[in-house]
Amino acid sequence: MTLHTPPAFDALLAAAPPQVSAEQARAVAAQHFGLHGACRLLSGERDLNFQITCADGAQFLLKVSNAAEDPLVADFQNQALLHIQHCDPTLAVQRIYPNNSGSYQITVLFDGQPLLVRLFSFVEGISLNRVEHPDVALRSSLGEHLARLGLALRGFFHPGAGHELLWDLKHASRLSDKIGLIQDPQERQLAQHFLDNFERHAQPHLKGLRAQVIHNDLNPHNVIVDASQPHPVRNILDFGDMVHAPLVNDLAVGVAYQLGTQGDPLAHAAPFIRAYHRIAPLEPLEQSLLVDLIATRLVLTVTITNWRAALYPENRTYILRNAPSAWRGLRALADVPREVAQQQIRRICSEETL
């Protein structure tokens, strides 16, 4: 495999972000959504996101999707957000708004290239990655929100839900060639070790697990909290990686970013797991496989971002933003025997039901 000839499966992640100026985005906001105000480009990976600030202080996020984005998948994301708002109106998730014609997505020509445009809520605050030491209350709040999100999505389906995405844990085996692109031999060996564990212990059981539509990307950059009092979660963002997959995968993704890197890695994540389990109890098999899935998410993070950073060196800093903590998490998990980690997860879950 070469860096620049990805299979169709990787097309969305391999495609370059669109080229749209803030002035073009401002004009689209005015013409198609009736919003007049300042426009600022925000950081992003495969899409372009613009903050629209109107004269009355109202703020919105205008998203211009990657040219490789399937309109059916975009509609899947839109309908999921509307479904969540209907099932759990108080859940702090991103909102989507219709354009002037009542549609939730529109195709706009930018310099001759057709691109999907959507409008979302913009919530003031700071992303969770900027909170230096998230306390127990915040980690518990995050676990509760993720569990509620899973409950709100239960029973939701859409023709686009079956799309394939490299960030989907159930497809982790397809990373083998990309692990070979990791230059450091020790890091490459560590990633391969945990991918082997996934294939040996978790993959054979995936089809027997509860499955539904999941958020699939609860990383700290997708969680907004209050800068002055970061205990309650203010907003969960970015539903662009949603897939239909085992429900426990959603928890594994979230826990992967809550691990401690000093001493026992799961101790730091315990409040998150307990809070989730209290609202959406894990089944015994899910508890047993959770540590394998957590490690596999970390492997996805270091492997996919390493590959994409090589493709787009100009955006390397943003693409690799979660990689250092992911490597620390993998090293910490490598020091804990699998059976010990499984016992600890069972104990964390049982403590909440005593």
What are these regions, as identified by a protein language model?
Residues L3, L181, T301-L354:
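ATP/Mg2+ or Mg2+-diphosphate-binding catalytic cores
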Residues M1-L35:
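Juxta-kinase regulatory segment immediately upstream of eukaryotic protein kinase catalytic domains
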Residues V64-G112, V131, V136-S140:
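A conserved alpha-helical element in kinase catalytic cores
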Residues E45-G57, L61-L62, I96, E199-N249, ...:
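Active-site acidic catalytic loop and adjacent metal/ATP-binding pocket
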Residues G102, Q113, V117-V131, A172-I182, ...:
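A glycine-centered beta->alpha junction motif in the catalytic cores
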Residues L247-P281, A295-P313:
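Active-site activation/catalytic loop segments of kinase-like enzymes and analogous catalytic loops
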Residues Q19-A29, G155-H158, R174-N216, D226-S228, ...:
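An alpha-helical support segment within catalytic cores of ATP-dependent transferases
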Residues N100, V131-Q189, A211, L293, ...:
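A cross-family kinase active-site recognition segment
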